[in-house]
Curated annotation (Swiss-Prot):
The keyword Protease does not apply. Belongs to the chaperonin (HSP60) family. Forms a cylinder of 14 subunits composed of two heptameric rings stacked back-to-back. Interacts with the co-chaperonin GroES. The keyword DNA-binding does not apply. One of its GO terms (biological process) is protein refolding. The lineage of its organism: Bacteria, Pseudomonadati, Pseudomonadota, Alphaproteobacteria, Hyphomicrobiales. Its EC number is 5.6.1.7. Keywords: ATP-binding, Chaperone, Cytoplasm, Isomerase, Nucleotide-binding, Plasmid. This is Chaperonin GroEL 4. It is an enzyme of class 5 (isomerase).
Amino acid sequence: MSAKEIIFSTEVRDRLLRGVELLNNAVKVTLGPKGRNVVIDRSYGAPRITKDGVSVAKEIELEDKFENMGAQMVREVASKTNDLAGDGTTTATVLAASIFREGAKLVAAGMNPMDLKRGIDLAVTAVLAEIKLRATKVNSSSEIAQVGTIAANGDASVGEMIAGAMEKVGNEGVITVEEARTADTELDVVEGMQFDRGYLSPYFVTNAEKMRVELDDPYILIHEKKLGNLQTMLPILEAVVQSGKPLLIISEDVEGEALTTLVVNKLRGGLKIAAVKSPGFGDRRKAMLQDIAVLTAGQMISEDIGIKLENVTLDMLGRARRVLIEKDTTTIIDGSGDKASIQACISQIKAQIEETTSDYDKEKLQERLAKLTGGVAVIRVGGATELEVKEKKDRIDDALNATRAAVEEGIVAGGGVALLRAKSALASLTGENPEITAGIAIVRKALEAPIRQIADNAGVEGSIVIGKLVDSSDQNQGFDAQTETYVDMIKAGIVDPAKVVRTALRDAGSIAALLITAEAMVADIPEKNAAQNAGNGAMGGRGY
């Protein structure tokens, strides 16, 4: 075990604070509509230019181990806020730095850090409740567009695109952001259920111009295992031919003789048919097949539940209004599934999402949920250069996350105004002793930090802005940094999701309070420079 360096009390807080301030100084410049860009070096390729706070925070690693611990703890605030709310990372960083800075001063002046922490916790709880009270629900598409526009740094086209996507696929529908191959940013909405498996043979194609299979009002055979020969399938194939309807086969695979026979029948015109592989792998494949069965009012054909292929009848097959199959995707449009059955399946998946602790499982369950609840919208981000596309994609990701948060918990006045106005919750709050009251005062001062930083980034003196807003009786009045005017933030459409503001404050208060109560730090002693020792040769130990 390597030797350790241990530091105590004042030195602990000094070193932590230096690390916190270094990270905060790099992140805070991105806050607000006039926030600046940060250029991040890459080990290969062009540097990355971003205005996304969490992207900047994640890149910061300091040489001094003790300073680095401070930076990493505040970086954790940004990451956690991003994970929970999807936005507000810069606000969380600015709040955490402000609370710790003021707290460290008071501890250095002789106050009890544990009482300061109690005061901070009391104040944060009161402010969180106040913000929740001030939140108003998001109802209209225009309000959703406003939230998206603000989070995308005033880009109205992004806000409108996100609002359009949510309108099409529903609030729980999947909206993905991808890099486009053109210069334009566009929204592509996939109605119904889509999964990433295409036709097994191009001979199944019915629309040669678009190279896709189009099946109208088809039967859908959902089979768990591979199909190697068609002997067992003959009864159901004959029944489908007599019905005059097309047939889609979804199974683990269709190979050899079975695939050849299907293709020959299709080419002869005897049977309009197509086959695709099942989506997913392992147990997840079985679950997705079950979802397709529920959506199309069919049965999954599986020997596990005692159904053999030779015994399958037409009423066991799924139905849909239309199926489109391209090279890599299959889209089932308007399945015949019973609404109550689909809702029961949705409720079951939601319960599994609540119970699971694995991020990967949660993501896959959410994909299943989205496929059942309302299709998929894809925002394809275009730009003149790769750098521009990546920067824009960051902003759209932020905007999308902020919009989801707004739908969940409502909106409050943006631009730091909600935090500033929530100070009213602390007006009559006092602690059991002066040190707890001092902890409350730390939070009261920190609530001004985001609006001060937004003003500073716009080149305006933050203290003057705060003074004017405090004097105003209009609770929604704030500073529009874009136009450098004082406006009603709600009417001007400058809003923040309540969830983002609350998550930022809660996480910042939690980490900053822990930093204040740190009294000792332990880190490995850096190893001596190997190159220097090699240069000293046999006398490498000289000077010890």
